[in-house]
Amino acid sequence: MKKKKPLTRSQNMARIKSKNTKPEIYIRKLLYKMGYRYRVNYSQLPGTPDIFILKYNTAIFVNGCFWHRHENCKIATFPKTHAEYWEKKFRRNVERDIEVREKLFEMDISVITIWEREINKMQRNEKYKEKYLKILKDRIERVFNYEEKDISVQMEIAEESMQ
């Protein structure tokens, strides 16, 4: 891999957004269409959730699989250069995600993580999107007391039960 000049690398990194990303905007539009009203980047809570639905006391994080290390995901690749730096960076991201989740649970706030991979699949597959949004609605409104951190686990269960 060709080594980049510090200025080039800095410019590349500056283009990586942390707020109002395309996946976040996609999820916000879906939630709005479903009738939910929410706060964006709600800084009054630990971890500043991407979306906070006050009525249901629910924090939603829209996580990139690469940066937040989505388990068993092909998007969560590991860079070949500067391995020590990346390993430390990723470990800290995951630790911080766990800490934030625990703090929110202590405050009796429901936490939902929506992964980049799931959003990609929703955009490609209308049937998947419908099922996903149904489970998301149930999670937000706490119809069931889910223990899984991940809606994709419930999607797998739902798909198996339909076969």
Protein language model regions, located:
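Nucleic-acid endo/exonuclease domains
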Residues: 1-113, 117-163
